[in-house]
């Protein structure tokens, strides 16, 4: 097995921490995110080639705020602190931090000193006096006001005189700005230099090698045992299934549960791709009557999610019991899920929506867990899917909620509503593809509204249902903006839906961003 050198990212609670990891991975190097208070023993055993301290919402100027484990500064490896990470490094190494008189949030211009090391020859332009200037993104209320012993200033501006600092001998670097965000144009170059030139990592994190490595790892871990996987047709479970099948072939059995709440022709597409084209063993269970029966009369979104999740567990457990030698349960867990689960153990957060996942399966199954995608971000999962030979349309399909159309039908779920919605949704997606807008949007779907409106078709009055169309663009799904689809495209979609889907006579377009709205309606 290939042993990659790796970067350790310690998370102090920044909204940008995952972006740091994305930038490191994009530079063809491996990294992992762990909480700032991870044990010194773990850090020593992890044996990082370099460490990045993330930003965070706390203030170093206050007592009882997070600090980096002291071992970080004793391992002899390069350390890069970003925003809060820079501040705690400076404070822990003998400098001081204070609340800034002038806070900086947004664009800033820095003057770069011509020091050897991290920022050498990295700049956006020079001014008339040949001073090198760097455009960056700031987001801070505190600043380092006294350098720790051994440090020098790398970059500054009038508002933040110590905007970037360095101890070249120990290879410790701090930046008050955020190199990981796209608003810092030279950010990728800065991270690339830290990872490869300063920490010495090779450019050895690539998908073909990772695929070969994971196939070997799965074979070694599973041995002769049988594996079962709940196949949803979504990107994550599909790529997990293809990867595991590449490794162990017929030892994998997938269970595909049709809950009656899938998209148009989805069951047939999944079976065609996996069973007939890839040769994966798939058990197709039509449980639509069970699911729809238990949803009768239920209007609360959370209650619907719980029922759908519970029914899935019962159906999956029933099918799993029929597979005699199954010892492993495979899941399409990806790295953001792992990070968020770890963060949930130490951070309080309000539940906006519960998430339906195979992870809710009961321990009575007595199966060991196999999560071959748990080291990958979503874009890496898609890249792996293409490397495995999955169809482009499947790999780049928009996200689909675990409860399916159950949370895109407002209020009570009925078979009639599901039929109307899946046909309207299919027209919407088909027209987006035809117009070249599908891949310009991050998620697009139709929502069924259980209200009727008056309409006129021909010479007659109609009184039929309403659907809403939703299309958003986003980098991370934490925030999103509504997609400004051309009016002519919206008109064509609306015309087709009201003419081709009998029972719908009105189409509206959702122009709400996130926040304040969520992407899904329920």
UniProtKB/Swiss-Prot annotation:
Residues in GMPS ATP-PPase domain copies: 205-397
Reactions accelerated catalytically: XMP + L-glutamine + ATP + H2O = GMP + L-glutamate + AMP + diphosphate + 2 H(+)
Sequence ranges assigned to domain Glutamine amidotransferase type-1 in this UniProt record: 6-204
One Pfam assignment: GMP_synt_C
Subunit structure: Homodimer.
GO MF annotations in UniProt: ATP binding; GMP synthase activity
Gene3D superfamilies linked to this entry: 3.30.300.10, 3.40.50.880, HUPs
Principal EC category: ligase
Statement: the UniProt record of this protein carries the keyword Nucleotide-binding: yes
Active site: residue positions: 83 (nucleophile), 178, 180
UniProt name for this protein: GMP synthase [glutamine-hydrolyzing]
Binding, ATP: 232-238
Stated role: Catalyzes the synthesis of GMP from XMP.
Enzyme Commission number(s): 6.3.5.2
Keywords: ATP-binding, Glutamine amidotransferase, GMP biosynthesis, Ligase, Nucleotide-binding, Purine biosynthesis
Pathway: Purine metabolism; GMP biosynthesis; GMP from XMP (L-Gln route): step 1/1
Species whose genome carries this gene: Nitrosospira multiformis (strain ATCC 25196 / NCIMB 11849 / C 71)
GO cellular component labels: cytosol
């Amino acid at each position: 097995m290939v042993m990659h050198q790796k970067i350790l990212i310690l998370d102090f609670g920044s909204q940008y921490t995952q972006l740091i990891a994305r930038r490191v991975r994009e530079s063809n190097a491996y990294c992992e995110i762990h909480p700032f208070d991870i044990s010194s023993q773990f850090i020593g055993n992890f044996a990082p080639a370099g460490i990045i301290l993330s930003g965070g919402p706390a203030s170093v100027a206050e007592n009882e705020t997070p600090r980096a484990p002291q071992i970080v500064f004793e391992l002899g490896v390069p350390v890069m602190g970003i925003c809060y990470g820079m501040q705690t490094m400076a404070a822990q190494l003998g400098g001081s931090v204070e609340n800034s008189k002038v806070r900086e949030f947004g664009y800033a211009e820095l003057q770069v000193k011509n020091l050897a090391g991290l920022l050498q020859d990295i700049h956006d332009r020079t001014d008339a006096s040949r001073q090198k200037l760097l455009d960056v993104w700031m987001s801070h209320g505190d600043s380092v006001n006294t350098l720790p012993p051994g440090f020098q200033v790398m970059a500054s501006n009038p508002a933040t005189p110590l905007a970037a600092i360095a101890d070249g001998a120990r290879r410790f670097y701090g930046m008050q700005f955020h190199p990981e965000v796209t608003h810092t144009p030279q950010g990728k170059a800065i991270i690339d230099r830290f990872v490869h030139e300063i920490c010495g990592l090779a450019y050895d994190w690539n998908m073909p090698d990772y695929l070969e490595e994971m196939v070997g790892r799965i074979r070694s871990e599973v041995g002769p045992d049988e594996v079962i996987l709940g196949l949803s047709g979504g990107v994550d479970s599909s790529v997990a299934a293809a990867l595991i099948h590449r490794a162990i072939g017929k030892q994998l059995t997938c269970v595909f549960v049709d809950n009656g709440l899938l998209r148009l022709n989805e069951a047939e597409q999944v079976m065609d791709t996996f069973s007939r084209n890839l040769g994966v063993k798939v058990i197709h269970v039509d449980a639509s009557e069970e699911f729809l029966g238990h949803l009768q009369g239920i209007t609360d979104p959370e209650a619907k999610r719980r029922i759908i999740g519970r029914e899935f567990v019962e159906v999956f457990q029933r099918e799993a019991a029929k597979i005699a030698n199954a010892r492993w349960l495979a899941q399409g867990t990806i790295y953001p899920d792992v990070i968020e689960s770890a963060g949930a153990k130490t951070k309080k957060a309000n539940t906006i929506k519960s998430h339906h996942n195979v992870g809710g399966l009961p321990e009575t199954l007595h199966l060991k867990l196999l999560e071959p995608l748990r080291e990958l971000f979503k874009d890496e999962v898609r890249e792996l899917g293409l490397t495995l030979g999955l169809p482009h349309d499947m790999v780049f399909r928009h996200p689909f909620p675990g409860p399916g159309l159950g949370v895109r039908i407002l209020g009570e779920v009925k078979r009639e509503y599901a039929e109307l919605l899946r046909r309207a949704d299919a027209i919407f997606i088909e027209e987006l593809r035809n117009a070249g807008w599908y891949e310009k949007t991050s998620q697009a779907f139709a929502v069924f509204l259980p209200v009727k409106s008056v309409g006129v078709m021909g010479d007659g009055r109609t009184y039929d249902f309403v659907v809403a169309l939703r299309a958003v663009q986003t980098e991370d799904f934490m925030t999103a903006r509504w997609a400004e689809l051309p009016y002519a495209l919206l008109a064509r979609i609306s015309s087709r839906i009201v003419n081709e889907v009998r029972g719908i006579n009105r189409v509206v377009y959702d122009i709400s961003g996130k926040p304040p709205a969520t992407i899904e309606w329920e």
